[in-house]
Each structure stands twice: as C-alpha cells, then as structure tokens.
Design a protein with these regions (language model features):
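DUTPase catalytic domain/fold
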Residues: 1-179
Length: 179
C-alpha cells in the first residue's frame, strides 16, 4: 500500500496532504510545513568568503568541500513537508521542484532530484520525513510560507539487475546510505 502520512512532529499541524491537482498529473504537490527563509546563494558565498578565504586554486577535494560546507553553513536549505511516504516494494519517490520555481523564483534543488527509497519510511533517525534541499540562485533572500507549494513527489517503479545481491538494511535517515 502506497500512501502519504504526516510525521508525528506535525501530526496536529494544519498541513495540506499531498495531492494531484488534475486527473493526468504525475506529481503530488508538496507544501512547506512551516515558514522558511531561503538565503541567496550569492549572500551565502560572500559571508562564507569572510569565514573561509578562497585562494587562487583550480579545485578543492571533496573532503575540503565538506569541511567548507560544515564550517561556513553554505548549503541548501532543508524545507520540511511534514510528510512521509509508505512505498511498496519496487517503488521509489522522486522529488522535483515545481516547473515554475527556477523560472519565476530562481529556486532549484541542490541534488537536482530527490530520491526517497521505500526503506526511508519510518527510519529511526527522522521517521522518514520528506525534505526538499532548496538553493536560491537569486540575489535576494526568499521567504517560503507555510502551506506554499514547494515541489512535486512522483511515485515511480524501479528495476534491479538479474545478478543484484543487495542485502543491507537502512540504519538511519537522511543521506544514511552513503555513511
């Protein structure tokens, strides 16, 4: 059974459940669970340069970039939907920003698309709470108000190779499969 539910933290909150707006819509519209200010990436970079001066370099390693991100806080804003999604075996949930978000508001997902695996549901770290990683490419900070549509969730099937031998189990929440 595939279904959306509120996470316990937002059980009594007045948040719209994800819905498809038309009969032929692929995506379920997702809304922000609370108010957020999405900082301008340009402002973040200016502030980050004061904390972590950037020298004349062609590249940094992934380890250096992780340190930069941790020390400066220069990263996408995690916008909660207050929702989780129970998926059947063989399904995954794709998260995408609304098609108007980059065009009108300069908002994009930091990870291009979000991938929610079936075993993310009810994980011990965050109950499977669905977040959108949002970057603001505009020169201004942008406010997203509680209840505003922030993206879409599309339920999709997946396939595995004939020789697939995956047998591990999820041990955490957000980003835990790469830890």
């Amino acid at each position: 059974m595939t279904l959306f539910e509120k996470v316990s933290k937002y059980a009594d909150a007045d948040i719209a459940m994800p819905v498809r707006k038309t009969e032929k819509s692929a995506g379920y519209d997702m809304v922000a669970a609370e108010d957020y200010i999405i900082p301008s990436i340009w402002v973040m970079f200016q502030e980050a340069k004061e904390i972590w001066p950037v020298g004349e370099t062609e590249f940094v390693t992934m380890e250096q970039m992780a340190k930069f991100t941790k020390e400066t806080g220069c990263k996408p804003t995690l916008v909660s939907t207050g929702m989780k999604c129970k998926l059947d075996q063989g399904e995954w949930l794709q998260l995408s920003v609304r098609s108007s978000s980059p065009l009108k508001y300069w908002l994009m997902l930091g990870n291009s698309i979000g991938v929610i695996d079936a075993d993310y549901y009810n994980n011990p770290d965050n109950e499977g709470e669905i977040f959108f990683q949002i970057y603001n490419l505009s020169p201004f900070n942008i406010q997203i108000k509680k209840g505003e549509a922030i993206g879409q969730a599309i339920i999709l099937p997946y396939a595995v190779t004939d020789d697939d031998a995956a047998c591990g189990e999820r041990t955490g929440g957000f980003g835990s499969t790469s830890k």
